């Protein structure tokens, strides 16, 4: 089964380019959003495996969205997706904020690929982060998604 993702970015051209790239690589883009309110609605409705969140969402912050998604998942169990922060800026510009965020990791937009997303999620799994469980094959499995692996088949 393909990894399902939600893309969150305030740049329509990037959203379309990312959708084409990720779908060509076997990932299923379940939806897109351009702001926090839209992202929360889409995340609850679509229940994606991973949410790619641009750090700069116009007047809003991707860090704030990551915190809201983490709180929503813990409280209401409505959103159980990993967040990967993305940006055109270098990771070093946000090192402390990324470390303090509940996101699974950071990915520069220039390195966006299904393989890199899987690497981030698998690295989190190997680190023993909560919310994940090991399946018999040793591949990462998402709770509530039987038979789903982070690795592309």
List PLM regions with ranges:
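Active-site residues of response regulator receiver
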Residues: 9, 54, 87
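Acidic catalytic/metal-coordinating carboxylates
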Residues: 35, 61-64
């Amino acid at each position: 089964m393909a990894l399902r993702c939600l893309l969150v970015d305030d740049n329509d051209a990037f959203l379309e380019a990312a959708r084409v790239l990720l779908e060509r690589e076997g990932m299923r883009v379940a939806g897109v959003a351009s702001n926090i309110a839209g992202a929360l609605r889409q995340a609850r409705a679509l229940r994606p495996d991973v949410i790619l969140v641009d750090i700069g969402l116009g007047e809003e912050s991707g860090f704030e969205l990551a915190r809201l998604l983490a709180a929503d998942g813990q409280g209401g169990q409505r959103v159980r997706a990993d967040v990967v922060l993305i940006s055109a800026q270098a990771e070093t510009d946000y090192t402390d904020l990324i470390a303090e965020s509940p996101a699974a990791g950071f990915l520069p937009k220039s390195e966006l690929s299904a393989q890199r997303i899987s690497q981030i999620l698998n690295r989190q799994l190997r680190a023993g982060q909560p919310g994940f469980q090991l399946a018999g094959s040793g591949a990462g499995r998402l709770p509530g998604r039987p038979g789903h692996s982070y690795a592309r088949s």
